[in-house]
């Protein structure tokens, strides 16, 4: 009996110890009654909270009911190295077993570095959305993307991005002392390009004619930047040289009346020119007289140094005209009684290279006859001043200035039926002088 009681107490002790242990390990709820009889439930306290601080912080963070958004993962794209885009590697033989190519690729996984220049901070808006991890310090990582900056000058080595020495000075001035690669946007530094700041210089005056007689050239120039000079050239026609008075070697391919004898250099060259029966010339002259505009009856005052468009009633359309009274026209020799002249421009729809030539007196009235009248130009100076001289001026010289004989082949234009000018008595005097000359 005693043994049974003792065994029972041992069993009860074990059960009591087990129950106490379970009671201690089970979470305890504390209740507090309010005055209105409503029970308020406190938060459950876990005895493991003190031993795991990170779990407690997690509970406190999520107690607000707001879950943090997961950080977006950047899409990783494969890096493609295209040798065709790299000048120094374009001709490399990558098919051989050991190609002579050395490529350095640097990967930065560290946190963003402090940039020592304001270059990255002031990039344009296109770069503002990029993540901080994509920012590369220019001073520390200038060789990371070296193919993009071939012109970058290394102050220490004196070489550019390709490893070759820089021979020419950079045209850019930058107050930070470091050259800036192109295409990186605006910076705080005050940098300008010398070439675009310079104002375009004025043209110099025309140089004297390269010859003292006959046909020559004159030039003018202006600066277009460092080590650059722009030059323009134009022809200048002076008094024909003595050797040119009878020279007809390069005139239109005219044929003589008998079709066999070419132009000579004898005294009868004018007669040979007058008696030319070239079929080509006849067709060309007919086309010229048909297409060219009629001479205006008065000289337009606003045409000086300008190109004007004037309506031609006979052709029912407008033609462009320009002044032809400059010094190189030598009106004092070829049109002695004219004060000013006009020359029509080449037409886009025209089938010839000719131009109408009209001259005017002191009263700006068209000279329709006599020594000052203009005649059609078979070759416009707008197309070729050299050919114009040989085709339109040289025949006048061959006839020794006898305009009456010249006008028999190239009659002055008066298609608008302007008043005859000069008057009859003056015209007869000029005609007598020309024949006696």
Curated annotation (Swiss-Prot):
Domain AMOP intervals: 262-425
Bridged cysteine pairs (disulfide): 209-236, 213-241, 224-228
Pfam families: AMOP (PF03782), TSP_1 (PF00090)
Gene: ism2
Compositionally skewed regions (Acidic residues) per UniProt: 165-176
Residues annotated as domain TSP type-1: 197-242
Main location class: secreted
Localization annotation: Secreted
Protein name as catalogued: Isthmin-2
Lineage: superkingdom: Eukaryota
Family annotation (InterPro entries): AMOP_dom (IPR005533), Angio_Inhib/Adhesion_GPCR (IPR051867), TSP1_rpt (IPR000884), TSP1_rpt_sf (IPR036383)
UniProt keyword annotations, A-Z: Disulfide bond, Glycoprotein, Secreted, Signal
GO CC annotations, alphabetized: extracellular region
Region (Disordered): 156-191
Entry similarity comment: Belongs to the isthmin family.
Signal peptide: 1-25
Glycosylation: residue positions: 217, 258, 349
Keyword Transmembrane helix: no
């Amino acid at each position: 009996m005693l043994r049974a009681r003792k065994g029972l107490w041992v069993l009860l002790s074990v059960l009591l110890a087990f129950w106490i242990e379970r009671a201690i390990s089970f979470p305890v709820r504390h209740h507090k009654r309010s005055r209105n009889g409503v029970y308020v439930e406190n938060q459950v306290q876990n005895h493991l909270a003190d031993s795991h601080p990170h779990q407690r912080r997690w509970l406190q963070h999520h107690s607000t009911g707001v879950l943090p958004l997961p950080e977006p993962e950047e899409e990783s794209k494969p890096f493609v190295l295209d040798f065709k885009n790299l000048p120094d590697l374009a001709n490399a033989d990558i098919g051989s077993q050991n190609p002579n190519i050395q490529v350095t690729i640097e990967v930065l996984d560290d946190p963003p570095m402090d940039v020592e220049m304001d270059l990255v901070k002031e990039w344009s808006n296109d770069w503002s959305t990029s993540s901080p991890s994509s920012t590369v310090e220019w001073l520390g990582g200038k060789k990371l993307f070296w193919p993009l900056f071939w012109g970058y000058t290394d102050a220490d080595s004196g070489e550019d991005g390709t490893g070759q020495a820089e021979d020419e000075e950079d045209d850019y001035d930058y107050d930070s002392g470091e050259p800036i690669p192109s295409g990186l946007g605006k910076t705080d530094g005050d940098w300008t390009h010398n070439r675009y700041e310079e104002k375009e210089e004025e043209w110099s005056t025309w140089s004297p004619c390269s010859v003292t007689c006959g046909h020559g050239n004159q030039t003018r120039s202006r600066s277009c930047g460092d080590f650059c000079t722009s030059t323009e050239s134009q022809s200048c026609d002076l008094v024909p040289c003595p050797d040119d008075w009878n020279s007809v070697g390069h005139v239109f391919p005219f044929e003589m009346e008998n079709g066999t004898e070419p132009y000579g250099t004898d005294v009868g060259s004018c007669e040979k020119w007058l008696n030319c029966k070239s079929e080509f010339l006849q067709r060309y002259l007919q086309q010229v007289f048909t297409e060219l505009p009629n001479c205006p009856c008065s000289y337009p005052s606003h045409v000086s140094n300008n190109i004007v468009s004037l309506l031609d009633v006979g052709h029912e359309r407008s033609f462009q005209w320009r002044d032809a009274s400059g010094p190189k026209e030598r009106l004092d020799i070829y049109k002695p009684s004219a004060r000013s002249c006009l020359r029509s421009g080449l037409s886009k729809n025209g089938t010839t290279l000719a131009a109408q030539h009209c001259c005017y007196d002191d009263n700006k009235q068209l000279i329709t006859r006599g020594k000052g009248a203009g005649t059609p130009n078979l070759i416009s100076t707008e197309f070729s001043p050299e050919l114009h001289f040989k085709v339109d001026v040289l025949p006048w010289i061959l006839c020794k200035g006898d305009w009456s004989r010249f006008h028999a082949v190239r009659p002055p234009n008066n298609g608008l039926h302007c008043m005859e000018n000069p008057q009859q008595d003056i015209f007869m005097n000029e005609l007598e002088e020309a024949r006696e000359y």
